[in-house]
Amino acid sequence: MAAGRAPKVPATAGHRCNAVGMNVLDRFSLDGRVAFVTGAKRGLGRAFAQALGEVGARVAISSRDQAEGESTAEELRALGLEVIAVTGDVTRYADVEEMASRVEGELGPIDVLVNNAGVCEHKPALDVTPAGWSEVISVNLDGLWFCCQVVGRSMVRRRQGVIVNIGSISGMIVNRPQWQPAYNASKAAVHQLSRSLAGEWAPFGLRVNALALGYVSTVMSPEPEGPETHQRWVEDVPMQRMATPDEVAPAVVYLASDASSFATGSVLVLDGGYTVW
């Protein structure tokens, strides 16, 4: 066998969806599976973790702040969900390995990885410093890649697993009125990396997809201030509003579950119609 070439395996390898006797709602269930969500102490990540837990997954959330991560995990446990918090920096490979090892030790092998950790800097291109550029690329791309490789290695060995990478319409369009070249570049790379891994790992029974979100009201993207920002972020959206984390979280459940068993290498756009123009 040529070096680097995936072995031939049955098309059903890693396929956990048994169509016989399974109704549509059953396909969204993650009962018995372990999900790991990065950057989940608040906002989108917290919403993703809650949604995955609500459909039956045992969930691990990561953040760089131990106290905040534990607080979020406690809030989710109070809802009746099985959640643990792990602490680490996704830009440090050793941290990623340690977090993955702890998740597997406490909950079991990771079945679903949701790469949500991300940062953004709003600056014109000529004002971006080398340090500012590196921080955004390091978290949004390097950290995501580290998580994909560390967790993906276990998934490939077990011939099953799902990865959902949180991208953005910023990887498809140029946002206005704010300029954010590093963020835009990082999210475009996330989309293409997702496609690349999907093609390479499909023979091993893995699925890899990306979710390209439009404007969502979070700490990173609060409600717009000023008429120009409001026009670009709200009025230019056919639905005339920003999304909320809880209404985009079900898309992660879809991509993580057997409901999307034939989807891989896709970039699912969820933007209220923003990119139709």
Regions found by a protein language model. Give the residues of each.
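Short C-terminal tail/terminal secondary-structure segment
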Residues: 21-27, 252-253, 264-277
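Conserved glycine-rich cofactor-binding loop
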Residues: 41-42, 65
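The beta1-alpha1 cofactor-binding region of Rossmann-like NAD(H)/NADP(H)-dependent oxidoreductases
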Residues: 66-67, 87-99, 130, 246-247
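Substrate-binding pocket helix/loop in short-chain dehydrogenase/reductase
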Residues: 124-125, 132-137, 221, 233
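Active-site helix of classical SDR
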Residues: 148, 186, 194
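Alpha-helical segment proximal to the catalytic Tyr-Lys
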Residues: 153, 199-203, 261
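Residue(s) in the substrate-gating loop at a strand-loop-helix junction
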Residues: 168
